[in-house]
Amino acid sequence: MTENIHKHRILILDFGSQYTQLVARRVRELGVYCELWAWDVTEAQIRDFNPSGIILSGGPESTTEENSPRAPQYVFEAGVPIFGVCYGMQTMAMQLGGHVEASNEREFGYAQVEVVNDSALVRGIEDALTADGKPLLDVWMSHGDKVTAIPSDFVTVASTESCPFAIMANEEKRFYGVQFHPEVTHTRQGMRMLERFVRDICQCEALWTPAKIIDDAVARIREQVGDDKVILGLSGGVDSSVTAMLLHRAIGKNLTCVFVDNGLLRLNEAEQVLDMFGDHFGLNIVHVPAEDRFLSALAGENDPEAKRKIIGRVFVEVFDEEALKLEDVKWLAQGTIYPDVIESAASATGKAHVIKSHHNVGGLPKEMKMGLVEPLKELFKDEVRKIGLELGLPYDMLYRHPFPGPGLGVRVLGEVKKEYCDLLRRADAIFIEELRKADLYDKVSQAFTVFLPVRSVGVMGDGRKYDWVVSLRAVETIDFMTAHWAHLPYDFLGRVSNRIINEVNGISRVVYDISGKPPATIEWE
């Protein structure tokens, strides 16, 4: 019998802040399970979840507007600790009898708050002291409205010159509100405050650890599928790789992985996937060479969105054909992770500000009545990587830069041809190899090469030649929503350019992309 790692749990009600998933990740980092729900949950749902504590997130709305989101009244009657962050503090103050007003000046960025009264939330936590010995905290503010009167049974814990109620508390009820964002690294003691709330005030044990998550997932897979056979589309990406390793540990040879080589992978990637998962780890893998099929389907197509759809459609066709060849397969495994679940829920309710379409395998033939196994659906990406390490997958594979689902299909601009893919693969491999040699790979968030379908004149020996152009792209980002182009050293870029032009016959010019996001996107297509 495995330990119940969901025994202690935090409920986070989402009011729409861009930082809400970060709050959840911080709670998970403290070893405590949490879930992220839309703000308008019912009393029955909260009772059923049975949280040890509730966090009210920030949000873009104004509590001074009549129809702005409010926490369900039951939240304040459930008898559990509450932590309101920014908008979450404002709605708590307003709903419990305080007052909120639009501020004349929007407070955004660094601020220093002075602790004026003792509170369990910040006791012994400080960044500096005032001349008369009062604790100071360096925090990150992002708000327009502010609380101008706190509920009568609350006390002021901390304030700034422009924000008289930066922290408020009702110690008896264990209700706390902060006007800043403790989840961001700019709030230097933010993690300690979250730890104080989750571990001390809510009294949650650190049960959510990689080893225990693996034990729990293995037990749940075995309980769900029993002795049945399971099929998984293995791409070699992080999510499908960790899913494969978890299933292999749980059910061994009853798992069949289908690896579709679409001809759009990185240099030697197919061989590496087959060697690692087949030869090294001993998984049962069906290798499907399908390069010709994908490239013929893409022939003549220049539109990026159309290319994506073609690649997705052909993958499903190939996967379905292989699945039908297997006997007695009852379950389809997918590497769905928690952000996918959150996005799907947001899409269904229409509450998300930005929704991207998410595609897993999907589209299986109607005659295949399969159940769905999603062992990663409670996990964030950083948790998936930690579990992968625990399962023995190599660090370099788990922490390599993101690679688009359509692969080189969207890194070859315009029509995709085998010649272009082969040139791009070799050029990109040189760029990545040089980044690693210069100890720059882990200093940038994503780096890759793009094939441009234009010829440029070059000089080779005594002759002139017209060959293709590639662009190097490297960015630095925290969340991939915005990004800066990476200021790589000139001598490094020169070395990469020389190697590509000299070693990859067919490329005569290398350029470097210095566009930020916005206005550009990270990928070219």
Swiss-Prot record:
Active site (UniProt): 86 (nucleophile), 181, 183
Pathway linked to the protein: Purine metabolism; GMP biosynthesis; GMP from XMP (L-Gln route): step 1/1
GO terms assigned for molecular function: ATP binding; GMP synthase activity
Glutamine amidotransferase type-1 domain location: 9-207
GO annotation, cellular component aspect: cytosol
Top-tier EC class: ligase
SUPFAM superfamilies: Adenine nucleotide alpha hydrolases-like, Class I glutamine amidotransferase-like, GMP synthetase C-terminal dimerisation domain
EC numbers for this chain: 6.3.5.2
Reactions listed under catalytic activity: XMP + L-glutamine + ATP + H2O = GMP + L-glutamate + AMP + diphosphate + 2 H(+)
Keywords: ATP-binding, Glutamine amidotransferase, GMP biosynthesis, Ligase, Nucleotide-binding, Purine biosynthesis
Binding site for ATP: 235-241
All residue ranges annotated as the GMPS ATP-PPase domain in the record: 208-400
Matching InterPro entries: Class_I_gatase-like, GATASE, GMP_synth_C, GMP_synth_GATase, GMP_synthase, GMPS_ATP_PPase_dom, NAD/GMP_synthase, Rossmann-like_a/b/a_fold
Subunit structure: Homodimer.
NCBIfam families: guaA_Cterm, guaA_Nterm, PRK00074.1
HAMAP family: GMP_synthase (MF_00344)
Purpose of the protein: Catalyzes the synthesis of GMP from XMP.
Protein's recorded name: GMP synthase [glutamine-hydrolyzing]
Organism: Shigella flexneri
Lineage of the organism: Bacteria, Pseudomonadati, Pseudomonadota, Gammaproteobacteria, Enterobacterales
